[in-house]
Structure formats: structure tokens, C-alpha cells
Amino acid sequence: MGLLPVVGITSPALITHKNHANPKIQRHNQSTSETTVSWTSRINLLTRNGRLAEAAKEFSDMTLAGVEPNHITFIALLSGCGDFTSGSEALGDLLHGYACKLGLDRNHVMVGTAIIGMYSKRGRFKKARLVFDYMEDKNSVTWNTMIDGYMRSGQVDNAAKMFDKMPERDLISWTAMINGFVKKGYQEEALLWFREMQISGVKPDYVAIIAALNACTNLGALSFGLWVHRYVLSQDFKNNVRVSNSLIDLYCRCGCVEFARQVFYNMEKRTVVSWNSVIVGFAANGNAHESLVYFRKMQEKGFKPDAVTFTGALTACSHVGLVEEGLRYFQIMKCDYRISPRIEHYGCLVDLYSRAGRLEDALKLVQSMPMKPNEVVIGSLLAACSNHGNNIVLAERLMKHLTDLNVKSHSNYVILSNMYAADGKWEGASKMRRKMKGLGLKKQPGFSSIEIDDCMHVFMAGDNAHVETTYIREVLELISSDLRLQGCVVETLAGDLLNA
């Protein structure tokens, strides 16, 4: 039976107090406390197994039997309403109403917090905030639930305001903020809060450390990452597998493969994720042969490669032109490990063929893919058309596919425009430029960053936002002058920086 019909049928019972229940039903209720426990136990078991509709039916039968639910009953059901989407919103509202009738939403901190959590997970923050403000007593879990909900939905300012109002901030509060900043792309803020957390005397756990390392990875903040690594060693987190995996990702992203190698070899225990980190990371850094060595060692150690592992192996083959070996790995993945190829695997093969100049093979693969090729796959082949023989005919076909996919990337138009220009077809090049202008496509400005005293300074072309812009320009002019005195020609890029 579906959830909503159950709720619709039993809603009168859900708001019936036990003192007004049917006397005939009440006679069956010989031991209310024991019966409440048994009913709640069944409801909790059903909810934990994802059977929310059956749990709702059980709750309906419980109320019809004249048995009053306790706080554990409400917490179990409210948790289910937050975790499952199909039809649970109406049940959540009814449970909230029933809890209000019993006064549990205001006077029982655990029930009130569960209601807040349910509304937050469903994105109903106005309702969650009303319940929060109405509660007489709040504990740290209540505050943290609101903060976590705000951060999950990207309401960073509201989360920060809630954090500032907290009477006491604990580890979970700080971690929710730091983790939320990372997930929503506020990497620099995450690192600032991580430092503030330590200054405040709260010792980070492995979850907060991983969040900080992820922020360092996304920013390329190697110095701060090294500092976090030293902290990890001093606080005996070095045997935490997840922390070590994050360190490997950080060092590979920053190009420090030797540091990544050291972390990997010092691990007492490794998981598939650990092996994937070095295989993918080394492949991305041009250490393709070593990446494939790790791929073989992984299997020798008894670890079963997964889809991510094969993405790393195929990437490695692509970077060093091992076409036949890459095709062999693709077959091993499908036949030996029964892994259904994803679009990223096909993308690796297209890149493998394209880098080797085998454009016809790459095109045949794209046409035979079981799924619709995306802009990454077609864009890879388009770039290869420029690099291998300036194949304008194929490039035009690929550009039509990208247009059909509604892909509006300036880089694809630039590639085709340059191909026309290289072939002396100036009208075609001009047409591509006009299309770019008509679509409002502009080249995304590149940026560079430098880390000084654990602070990231990011610079973009034409950006004057940095507080030291004037001083930076003066220093850049001095460097350019010295270069000219030494007989060096200042590149256009340097001139652009000065004139930006």
C-alpha cells in the first residue's frame, strides 16, 4: 500500500489522544508502556530498512489501538521522513502536528531537533526555523542541525549567523561549517575557519582534517596542506586511511608525486580508494608507466579494480600512446571484471585514439557508444582534428553535434576558427567569431594564485580587486625593465598584465 493513501486514511487517528480513544480498542491495551516499546521497536526497524510506508501503517495501527507513541517513536519516523522523498512530506507534517498536540515539539529537545532535521533535509527552512525558535530548550545537536541544513542548501550567511549565536560551539559545529564551505566551493573560507577552530581550542577530528585537505587540494594550497600533514603526524592521525587518501590526492593535484608516493608507502593499511588515488594521480601527472605498475601491483595484492581504477589505467595509456594496451585494459574491464563501461571510459578511449592520430577509429567509437556522447568526448575529438592534419570536414561534423547538444563553449568555436584560418579560409574563421559574439561567448579569464603565509592570493586577467594592485604593478614594471636591460623581450602577456 502506498504511503499517501495510508496517511490519508489514518490522519484522524494520528491526531487522537489516548484519553479519547475508542474504549473497545483500549481494552486490548493491557500494558501501555510495554506495548509502546514493542510498537516503536517494529516502527524503528521498518524505518531503518527504508520501509517508510509500512512504518506509517504500523504507526496508524498503533494510534488506532489507543497506544500513545513516545519520543523514540517520533524520532524514528521523522528521521525516515527526512531521508526518503516519495510521499513522506505529508506524513512529516502530520507527525509534526501530533507532536505539537502532545507538546513534544516545544518541550522535548530530541523530538524538536528531529522535526528540524526533517524539515531541513526537505529544504523547508522557514518551517525548520519556526520550530527552532519555538523550542524552549536547545542543545548543541539542535543548533548543529540548523547549521548543517543551512550549509547543505548553500545558505552560508544564515549558517554563519546561526553559528555566531550559538552559546557553545563544539567539534560538530565547526566541522559542519568547514565541510559546508568546501562542498559549496568556498575553499579559502574553509581554511580560515579551520585555523579559527584550532585557535578557539577545539581539536579537529579526522572529518575536519579531511575537509581542510580537500580545500587545500581544490586550491592547490601546498604550503597549508604541508602544515595540515604535520598536524596529522603530531596528532597520530597517520594511520587513518581516509586522511592518507586525502593527502595522496592533495600531493598529486599539486604535482608532488614523490610526497604522494611516501604517504602511500607509509600506509599500514590500504583500500581500493588508496590504490585508485595513486593510479589516477600518477597518470594525471605524466607518470603513466608508474601508474600502470601500481595497477598491476594492486591486483597482485588481492585488490579488485573498480571503474575508477580503469579510468586511471586508460588515462595512463592515453598519455603515453599505448593504444593496444589501453584497448586490452578496456576489454579486461568488461570481460574479466564485468564492469559496464561508463562515458568516462569511452572518453579515455576516444582520447587514446585521438592522441595517436587515429581519428577514424575515434569517430567509429563515438558512433558505436551505447550512450549519447557528451561535450567532453566530442570536444576531445574536435581538438584532435586540429592537432592531426587540420581535418576541417570532420571538425564541422563534430561542431554540429556540439550544437545539437546545446554546448556553448568558446573553446570549441576558437578551435574551428583557428582551423579555418590555418587553411586560409578567412570567411569561415570570421563566421565562427561572429557566432561566438552572437551567442555572447567569451573566453573565461585565466587565473593564477600564489600562497604566502598560508594565505592564497588569486589573480585574474583584468582584475584590480587585490588590495596591493598598485604595488604589484610597480614591482612587475621593475621586473620588466630589468628584463629589457638584459636584452630580453617582454612577452605580450606581461604587457597585458601591466595594461590590464
From Swiss-Prot:
It holds the Pfam family PPR. Its main location: plastid. PPR repeats lie at residues 35-69, 70-106, 108-138, 139-173, 174-204, 205-239, 240-270, 271-305, 306-336, 342-376. It is found in: Plastid, Chloroplast. One of its GO terms (molecular function) is RNA binding. Residues 377-453 are annotated as: Type E motif. Residues 454-484 are annotated as: Type E(+) motif. GO terms for cellular component: chloroplast. Keywords: Chloroplast, Plastid, Repeat, Transit peptide. It comes from the Eukaryota. Residues 1-54 form a transit peptide. One of its GO terms (biological process) is RNA modification. NCBIfam families: PPR. Belongs to the PPR family. PCMP-E subfamily. PANTHER family: PENTATRICOPEPTIDE REPEAT-CONTAINING PROTEIN. This is Pentatricopeptide repeat-containing protein At1g05750, chloroplastic. The gene is PDE247.
